[in-house]
Structures are given as structure tokens and as C-alpha cells.
């Protein structure tokens, strides 16, 4: 299982990458994509929608199951990765390169409530 130390993680298997101050990418972890199997479809919110920490913002459908995407932060959706519409399986190929949402955080301090790579990994054991 691949984890990146520069990312923050949620117990719900999402990762957060700070790209510019209060702007982040959100995606699912390598562990999550492995558990899901081949990803067939990703349902996402619209640009300018609000995401709420701990609340689902979309669904990932795979060959095995449909699973809710749970937001690790509060914020406003700035962009949705349009590549996922035609190539949702790209998440299986590289879950950390193929983000789902670009979000402007409501509060940067929320990042401190997320897990480090080591804490996330320990929670899987």
C-alpha cells in the first residue's frame, strides 16, 4: 500500500493535498481504491457546491460495490476532475495523482485534525 508523507488523511480513506494556502485537492487513498476494485463511475458535486466535513459528497461505484465519498474538510468546490467522467479507472492506476475535487477550505486549521501517513497506516492495522 502506497502512502505519501506530504498528504493528510481521513479515517474514511480520503486524502488531502494542500496546493496553495487554503486550496486543496481531495482524493481517495491507495487502500480505498484497492478495496473497491475496478472503479467504474465517480459521482461528484458541482463547482460552487459546499462540502461538509464528515458528510458524503459523492459516490464511487466499482465492480464490487458503491461507496460514499466522505468529505474530510469543510469548503467550497472550485473544480471537479473532469478526467473521471471518461476515465474513472485512472484512480486505480494512481489514486494520488488523480484527485476528485479541488476545494477552497472554510478553515485551514481543519488540516490539523487530519491524520499523518503514519497515523492513517496505524489505523488500518
Swiss-Prot record:
What's the source species for this entry?
A: Clostridioides difficile (strain 630) (Peptoclostridium difficile)
Q: What does this protein do?
A: The glycine cleavage system catalyzes the degradation of glycine. The H protein shuttles the methylamine group of glycine from the P protein to the T protein.
**Which NCBIfam families did the record assign?**
gcvH (TIGR00527), PRK01202.1 (NF002270)
**GO BP terms:** glycine decarboxylation via glycine cleavage system
Keywords, in A-Z order: Lipoyl
Entry's cofactor comment = Binds 1 lipoyl cofactor covalently.
Which coenzyme or cofactor does it need?
Answer: (R)-lipoate
Please give the family membership noted in the entry.
Belongs to the GcvH family.
Q: Would you tell me the Gene Ontology cellular component terms?
A: cytoplasm; glycine cleavage complex
Q: Does the keyword 4Fe-4S apply?
A: no
Q: Which Pfam families match?
A: GCV_H (PF01597)
Q: Which residues form the Lipoyl-binding domain?
A: 23-104
Top-level taxonomic group: Bacteria
Q: Enumerate the transmembrane spans.
A: none
Give the protein's recorded name.
Answer: Glycine cleavage system H protein
Q: State whether it acts alone or in a complex, and with which partners, per the record.
A: The glycine cleavage system is composed of four proteins: P, T, L and H.
Q: Which InterPro entries match?
A: Biotin_lipoyl, GCV_H, GCV_H/Fam206, GCV_H_sub, Single_hybrid_motif
Modified sites of kind N6-lipoyllysine: 64
